[in-house]
């Protein structure tokens, strides 16, 4: 089959990260070598939130949000400090609370492969970020294996959790010839508010999410073109650690990728677009009020990348490319009839916000000999941002702080331009089949996002509407912010078996890895105290008003992961001890702890595989968190241990049933990255502000059928 010149011309205006080559990230190592597999990533979690699929990755955690919108945290870096790529797309949160976080746009039913790279990211896949890269990729398009044959397959899955009465369902179908493929995935998830370990309902944590995606692909003559289109509709999603809830999120996207093999190497191209309509307010009796807040966002971008073979058998590859990303944002709050504070005008928070990035990069990966592999790269990125003039709700005394702030903001020039340089240098040394040492340095840069630079309100209510940290504080932007520059050193020592499960490229049958890291961040965007208030008017629940500000900071820690076979027999099958452990510290150089640093934690499991059975007993321990951010009044959280059990059985290669118990002993605990329980205080209107409670005991069941 031939792809028409017209189709090639359209596709060449863009790039992809290579859907021709399926990538599995079962190994977490510095990315001098890309591990490939035709098997999708498996998870031990029952979840409707893709951010939780990566819970077993060393150094990875999540900051609590809505039921499908947790924010990823990697070695202490969170949210915009991480590069999130969805099938190569870069999507921006169009919300001052990041309720529509990038990973929430790709539900677990659409995820086929994942990759997590902490800290030292190759310049070809990471810009405008300082903490690492997370990639979620759909399963690669499937085709019939011979001419004249028609491939048709599909399946469905249903799962349920008792802790929040969650029911999730998904369907998928594929029809393909040798050179053409069409696939559809649809999913829906709905849940009530969850119950904590003490039996109390965690108010305003209910949600519903609906997602649809259609993928069309064609291949032939060493090339492949893939078009993926889809929609998301979330009618409501509660956020118990924020002042507002999501009352609607609609998005539509299109993602076109093209790959072609030449004698000199590979050409990758991608063109993408996404539009988002987002609304905040209140939707249930669990938290009442009237305050509509609307945002409209649009992402558009492309990437062109050439992988040029400089040696035989991929021993030396030069990657050169160019990227462009454009983000448009309008954030406005309609007036509330009869309100003296929220009327008579529309509050304009971000007026025609623009953030455009243009990047060039070059990267050389070279295998020196059988033991040494190196990768070096440089990236130059121009970031331009701007916004229009703004206005407060009104001109009366209640609106005077915001009125004066709007006048001051409008009197200043808003346009900003940053020229950011990234550098990466990695080396991998494998003295034999059982040992690998990897180490590297990276300079990574991130420019402030639109909310960090351009939110302007000085009234307490307006400031509290900008907050993606779940800490109950209020925030205002800063036109004088500088880009963050992170200088990171990291290394990994990896002892492992010479053979792997699933053959070459699979997971070693046993391994032990240690990864220390250190980052010095110039102009880290933290926050300074500019005022205070009582949360919901409760004297025992004080909060701070903060302004984004640059401060130098240090982040450091160590991660460990392992897999160790304990027993293998005909009667018991294979039993292995697996897990991860880690600790992160973060401090400003002028004093004070950074927010949301994960204390010492261990996730350890005994896993048995016997025939069609997979059984897993898991222990999740988190130490007491005492090193907290005083400016944000971050709560101290107690240590806790949670036990989870899960089993699955596969019938005749097409039906899999699973059952498990999460938090077996119904432990009442607070996640150290959960933030504060605002919806609880909003209902009680008394007492102090508490840490957000974690999930109580849950019976989880599911079935997956393929045909």
Question: What are the language-model segments listed below?
Answer:
Residues 160-190, 199-235, 244-267, 306, ...:
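Transmembrane beta-barrel wall of Gram-negative outer-membrane proteins
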Residues 233, 277-279, 328-330, 335, ...:
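Surface-exposed extracellular loop regions of Gram-negative outer-membrane beta-barrel proteins
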Residues 242-263, 295-301, 349-355, 409-426, ...:
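Outer-membrane beta-barrel signature, preferentially recognizing the C-terminal barrel domain
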Residues 25-147:
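Acidic, small-polar-rich N-terminal luminal/periplasmic segments of exported/outer-membrane proteins
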Residues 158-164, 177-179, 188-192, 220-222, ...:
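Transmembrane beta-strands of outer-membrane beta-barrel pores
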Residues 94, 109-113, 118, 123-198, ...:
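Outer-membrane beta-barrel translocator/receptor signature
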Residues 367-374, 382-383, 505-526, 530-627, ...:
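Gram-negative outer-membrane beta-barrel transporters
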Residues 445-446, 527, 624-627, 649-707:
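C-terminal beta-signal and adjacent terminal beta-strands/loops
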């Amino acid at each position: 089959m031939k792809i028409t010149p017209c189709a090639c011309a359209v596709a060449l205006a863009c790039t992809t990260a290579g859907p021709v080559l399926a990538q599995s990230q079962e190994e977490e190592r510095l990315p001098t070598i890309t591990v490939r597999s035709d098997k999708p990533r498996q998870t031990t979690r029952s979840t409707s939130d893709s951010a939780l699929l990566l819970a077993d990755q060393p150094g990875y955690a999540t900051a609590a949000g809505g039921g499908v919108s947790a924010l990823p945290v990697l070695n202490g870096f969170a949210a915009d400090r991480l590069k999130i790529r969805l099938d190569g797309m870069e999507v921006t949160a169009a919300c001052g609370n990041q309720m529509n976080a990038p990973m929430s746009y790709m539900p677990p039913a659409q995820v086929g492969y994942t990759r997590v790279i902490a800290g030292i990211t190759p310049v070809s896949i990471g810009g405008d970020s300082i903490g690492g890269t997370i990639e979620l990729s759909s399963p690669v398009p499937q085709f019939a294996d011979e001419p004249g044959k028609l491939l048709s397959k599909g399946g469905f899955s249903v799962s349920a959790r008792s802790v929040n009465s969650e029911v999730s369902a998904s369907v998928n179908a594929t029809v393909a010839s040798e050179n053409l493929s069409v696939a559809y995935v649809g999913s829906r998830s709905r849940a009530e508010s969850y119950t904590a370990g003490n039996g109390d309902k965690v108010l305003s944590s209910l949600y519903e999410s609906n997602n649809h995606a259609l993928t069309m692909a064609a291949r032939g003559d060493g090339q492949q073109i893939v078009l993926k289109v889809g929609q998301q509709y979330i009618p409501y999603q509660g956020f118990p650690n924020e002042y507002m809830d999501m009352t609607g999120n609609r998005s539509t996207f299109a993602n076109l990728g093209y790959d072609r093999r030449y004698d000199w190497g590979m050409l990758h191209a991608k063109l993408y677009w996404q539009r988002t309509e987002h609304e905040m307010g209140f939707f249930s009796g669990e938290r009442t009020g009237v305050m509509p807040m609307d945002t409209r966002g649009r992402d558009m971008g492309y990437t062109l990348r050439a992988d040029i073979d400089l040696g035989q058998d991929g021993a030396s590859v030069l990657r050169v490319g160019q990227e462009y990303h454009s983000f448009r944002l309008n954030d406005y709050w309609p007036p509330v009839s009869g309100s003296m504070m929220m009327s008579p005008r529309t509050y304009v928070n971000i007026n025609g916000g623009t953030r455009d990035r243009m990047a060039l990069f070059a990267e050389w990966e070279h295998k020196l000999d059988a033991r040494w592999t190196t990768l070096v790269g440089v990236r130059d990125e121009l970031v331009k941002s701007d916004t229009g003039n703004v206005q407060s709700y009104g001109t009366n005394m209640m609106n005077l702080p915001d009125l004066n702030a709007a006048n001051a903001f409008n009197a200043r020039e808003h346009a900003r331009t940053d020229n950011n340089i990234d550098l990466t240098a990695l080396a991998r040394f494998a003295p034999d089949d059982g040992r690998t040492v990897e180490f590297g340095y990276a300079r990574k840069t991130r420019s402030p996002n639109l909310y960090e630079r351009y939110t302007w309100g000085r009234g307490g209510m307006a400031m509290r509407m900008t907050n993606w940290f779940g800490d109950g504080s209020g925030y205002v932007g800063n036109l004088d912010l500088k880009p963050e520059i992170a200088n990171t050193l990291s290394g990994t020592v990896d002892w492992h078996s010479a053979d792997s499960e699933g053959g070459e490229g699979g997971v070693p049958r046993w391994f032990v890895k240690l990864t220390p890291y250190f980052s010095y961040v110039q102009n880290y965007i933290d926050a300074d105290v500019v005022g205070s208030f009582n949360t919901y008017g409760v004297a025992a629940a004080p909060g701070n008003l903060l302004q984004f500000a640059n401060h130098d900071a240090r982040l450091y820690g160590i991660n460990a992961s392992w897999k160790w076979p304990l027993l293998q027999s005909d009667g018991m099958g294979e039993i292995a001890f697996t897990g991860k452990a880690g600790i992160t510290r973060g401090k400003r150089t002028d004093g004070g702890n950074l927010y949301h640093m994960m204390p010492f934690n261990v996730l350890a499991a005994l896993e048995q595989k016997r025939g069609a059975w997979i059984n897993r007993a898991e222990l999740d321990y988190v130490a007491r968190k005492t090193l907290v951010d005083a400016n944000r009044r971050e709560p101290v959280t107690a240590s806790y241990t949670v036990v989870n059990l899960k089993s699955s059985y596969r019938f005749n290669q097409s039906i899999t049933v699973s059952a498990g118990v999460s938090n077996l002993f119904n432990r009442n605990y607070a996640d150290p990255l959960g933030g504060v329980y605002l919806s609880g205080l909003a209902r009680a209107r008394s007492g102090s502000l508490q840490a957000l409670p974690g999930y109580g005991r849950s019976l989880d069941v599911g079935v997956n059928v393929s045909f």
